[in-house]
């Protein structure tokens, strides 16, 4: 997945932020051109603001709180619908269903974003909640983690769905790799 340096193109940090968000909680929609929606709990307001800061040149409205189902309150922003996002949509969606592009290359920063969105530490393991993806996509993600970082892991059943579990030694190496990239307000995801 390569996105060129044309007018309106993204920096490497913006690109990594989008990749990590799409592997996590980010969502895209497309009519003529695609847009990215970033949405988290109001308790992660600082995290949404942090993501917004990097993508603000593509956003018209600052993040806002909204009321979800029941008592849930979220905090979100959307980028503008732009051609620069359309290739991401084509890469990550088939028939409006999110998938993992086989050409995806992970970077430490995209991995850090993905972990902040959908990662959890439990005992000596790190988990990536990949339940939204098909079995094939999850296997591809395991392959990418091994190819790009040398991390060993497996698919672990969480209730009735599978998710990625990094083995202890790989979990330690991943923690060392991404911890410097994680802002202090998200460090609770990676306790010492």
Task: Give the role of each language-model region.
Residues 1-192:
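Internal intein/HINT superfamily modules and their associated LAGLIDADG
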């Amino acid at each position: 997945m390569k996105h060129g340096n044309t007018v309106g193109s993204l920096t490497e940090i913006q690109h990594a932020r989008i990749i990590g968000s799409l592997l996590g909680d980010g969502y895209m929609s497309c009519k003529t051109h695609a847009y990215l929606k970033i949405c988290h709990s109001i308790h992660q307001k600082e995290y949404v603001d942090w993501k917004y800061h990097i993508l603000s040149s593509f956003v018209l409205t600052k993040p806002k709180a909204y009321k979800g189902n029941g008592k849930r309150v979220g905090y979100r922003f959307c980028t503008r619908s732009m051609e620069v996002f359309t290739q991401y949509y084509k890469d990550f969606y088939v028939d409006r269903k999110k998938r993992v592009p086989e050409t995806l290359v992970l970077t430490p920063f995209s991995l850090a974003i993905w972990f902040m969105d959908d990662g959890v530490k439990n005992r000596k393991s790190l988990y990536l909640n990949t339940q939204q993806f098909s079995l094939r996509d999850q296997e591809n993600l395991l392959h990418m983690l091994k190819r790009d970082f040398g991390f060993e892991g497996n698919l672990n059943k969480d209730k009735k769905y599978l998710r990625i579990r990094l083995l202890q030694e790989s979990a330690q190496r991943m923690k060392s790799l991404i911890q410097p990239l994680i802002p202090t307000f998200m460090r609770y995801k990676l306790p010492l």
